[in-house]
C-alpha cells in the first residue's frame, strides 16, 4: 500500500504555497548539505519578502534558471573548472541594469529577481557581476540532481510559475547553519510548509510522467511468447524495458519481477551472483502462470555503481572483501539503486496491484512508497553454489534480504529443479 501520504501532502501544500507567493522550506539529504533553504517564486518577490529572506539566511540570494534562460540572458558559468563538491552550476552574478543603486539592498535585489523572472528580460537587462547569483538547474530537476537548485525549479513548474525560483540557506542568529530540528522550529514559528528533496522526488515519480514508450514488439523466448515494451527516461535517456505475458490491462495481483541489469550474471553466466538464475526463474514462473511482467532496469550494474566499478569490486572480493565492504571500499553506497523508473513503467502498464517476485525488502517497500500497490511477494527458489554462497549470505545477513538459505551440501537435493547449478 502507499506509505508516504504525509510527504506527498506536504509537497502538495508547498506547491499551493508557492503559487500563492508564500515561502516554503526545502531540506536536502543528511548525506548532502543537510540544510534548509527558504524558497520563493521569483515573480512573487517583494521588498518585504526579500527583507525576510535576507534577515534569516546567509544573504546569498540564488535564483534557479534553466540552461536556455541562462543562454538567452548571456549568463556564462562563473568558472570553467567547477570544483564545488556538489557541482552547483553558478553563472556570473548579476544586478538589474536600471532601477537600482548599489544592487545590494533588499529593494535592489528585488528588482533584479523580478527581471530574472520576467520572460521579456534580455541580456541588456543586467550588469555583471552583481548581488544575485543565478544557478543553472539540471533539465531533469531533483530526480536528476537532488539539490536545492533543482527543487526550486521543480516547485516553480509544478506551481505553474515562471521558471525562476529564489532561495537562500537558513542560518541561526549566530550565523551557524540551521540543521533539521532548528529548521522545523523556525518553520513552526513562521507557519511555513517544510518538505524534503526526497519528498519532492517521490512526488514526481508518483504523479509526473518521466518515461516515454518508444517501441513494442512480440518476443519469442525459450519460455514462450512475451511482448517487449521499451521505455526511455526523459531524465537521462536510459532505455529500460518490460517483458509482458498475457493481458495485464487493469488486472489485479499481477506477478511482477523488477530486475536490475547484470551483464555478468544475465548474459555471461557469472557464478558470483544469482542474478541470471533469478531472471530465468522469474520468466519461467510468469510463463507458467500465463500472466506477469518483468521490468528490466538498465544502468544498475553492481547495485548501481556501474560496470567498471563492479569489476573492481569483484577484484576486491577476491582479496577477501564481501560484496558490501567492496562497494564501501570503492567509496560507493552499499546499494545505490533507485526504483522510480520501475514504478513509472508499471504505472504506464496500468497495473491495479502486483505480487512482487523478490527477496529484497528495500525493493518491496520502495515500490510501495512510490505508489505501487504491492499486495504481497512471491518467493522463488534460491540458486546457490560454492561460488555465490558468500554473496548470498552477505545479502541475507548484512542487507536484510528475505533468504532461506539451505546448507550447501543439500543444495542439489533440495533445489534440483533450479538451473545454473553447475557453478561449483
Swiss-Prot record:
This is Riboflavin biosynthesis protein RibBA. The keyword Zinc applies. Catalyzes the conversion of D-ribulose 5-phosphate to formate and 3,4-dihydroxy-2-butanone 4-phosphate. Catalyzes the conversion of GTP to 2,5-diamino-6-ribosylamino-4(3H)-pyrimidinone 5'-phosphate (DARP), formate and pyrophosphate. It comes from the Bacteria. The record marks 131, 169 as: Essential for DHBP synthase activity. It comes from Chlamydia trachomatis serovar D (strain ATCC VR-885 / DSM 19411 / UW-3/Cx). Gene3D superfamilies: DHBP synthase, GTP cyclohydrolase II. Mg(2+) 2 binds at residues 33, 148. Zn(2+) binds at residues 262, 273, 275.
